[in-house]
Amino acid sequence: MLAEYRGKKTIEMLWRGIWAYVKHHRIDAMIGCASIEGTDVSLIANQLSFLYHFSQAAPEWQTSPLARRHTEMNRVSKGDVDVKKALASLPPLIKGYMRVGAKFGNGAVVDRQFGVTDVFVVMPISEIETRYIEYFDEDAAAIVKAA
């Protein structure tokens, strides 16, 4: 998306459209990946460890990359994770996913071609906080009818 269109209203419109799709097709969970800038995992160890220790998906949603692509996320012990620094340095998209209720897989993939490290994201619909459902649902019906 072009930088000039990355504002709050555009993101909200995208989320309302996603929510309309989820409702229309009765989807149980949304999955995908999110990227952390950088391929030197020693520089993003605190962020990866934070996701591993504090925001890991439940066992029934757990997944990890293929062994040949797997990068360990548990790089710093839970007690040594600088939570404040991790939260401040995580990409806005990952923080947004976390606010809504998303969780993360076990293991990351370094993508040198794009200069990022990717993590698996799962958002079971049943775990989305009610306030977000109410917020994004106000226009969802209109979007579904227009489609």
Model regions: which residues?
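Acyl-donor binding region in acyl/amide transferases
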Residues: M1-K103, A108-T117, I128
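Short, well-ordered beta-strand micro-motif
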Residues: F120-P124
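Long, contiguous binding/interaction regions
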Residues: E127-F136
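Short, cationic low-complexity segments
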Residues: D139-A147
